[in-house]
Amino acid sequence: MKKEEKINYFWKYVLLTVGGILILIPLMVTVFSSFKKTKDIMNHFFAFPNPITLDNYKRLLADGVGGYFWNSTVITVLSVLVVMLFIPAAAYSIARNMSRRKAFNIMYSLLILGIFVPFQVIMIPITVMMSKLGLANMWGLIILYLTYAIPQTLFLYVGYIKLSVPDSLDEAAEIDGADKLTTYRKIIFPMLKPMHATTLIINALWFWNDFMLPLLILNKDSSMWTLPLFQYNYSGQYFNDYGPSFASYIVGIITITIVYLIFQKHIIAGMSNGAVK
């Protein structure tokens, strides 16, 4: 290995190490603090909890964290399922026809324009519209998530199909007597597994952790709060009692971390191929 390459590798490892430390230390502090009493957090912020206490989690359960956890789970699961059911089919149709029919190119261009529209521009009109339509509830929030998920998810799927799923598969299936629906269901959809995992985790992370949309749509009815909205109000309620707040953060982190670990091996392939075209 040349001297210049060794230097490059050295600085890469230094940057990765520093980045890892900057991520792990706050995570470690959050985990430790969730098992400490508030006075121990204030006096020994970075220390291992001694003694370990579950009082913070007991208080969370007593304050109804389970209901807010359920709200977040329902919203995230339903939103992800609908995205995964319809957008791959739309992307397949667009990818196969955009080179032959101008209308599909125009449709695709219009749909992905949403990527470039800042949320702040439409934040107030969206809030007013959903309120007037009587959709200031969980169903309205799911509709908004589906709407905002279309541009990026469609962009990734179309790019992946054009790069990794050749037209010859459709032709071979047609020769064997398969119609378009059968071809998509039995051949194309299973081949999109890396992109399914990628879009699932990207959208699930967003839906689960999102704060702004629930704040705008659900804030008036506390029974419909999602976990991030509960955490925001809970931190304000127990501003001088940090233990329960840290415990609520762990409840939010651990679920989505498990989902990420399950699908992580497919994410890199899906992202690298889907963003090429």
Curated annotation (Swiss-Prot):
TM region(s), chain numbering: 13-33, 74-94, 110-130, 141-161, 198-218, 243-263
Among SUPFAM superfamilies, the record links this protein to:
MetI-like
Does the keyword section mention Methyltransferase?
no
State the UniProt keywords alphabetically.
Cell membrane, Membrane, Sugar transport, Transmembrane, Transmembrane helix, Transport
GO cellular-component term (any): plasma membrane
The way it spans or sits in the membrane comes to: Multi-pass membrane protein
| Record Gene3D superfamilies | MetI-like (1.10.3720.10)
Give the record's GO biological process terms: transmembrane transport
Compartments reported by the entry: Cell membrane
Q: What positions does the domain ABC transmembrane type-1 occupy? A: 69-263
Does the record bear Transport in its keywords? yes
Q: Which PROSITE patterns match?
A: ABC_TM1
Q: Which family does it belong to?
A: Belongs to the binding-protein-dependent transport system permease family. MalFG subfamily.
What the protein does? Involved in a binding protein-dependent transport system responsible for the uptake of melibiose, raffinose and isomaltotriose.
What name does UniProt use for this protein? Multiple sugar-binding transport system permease protein MsmG
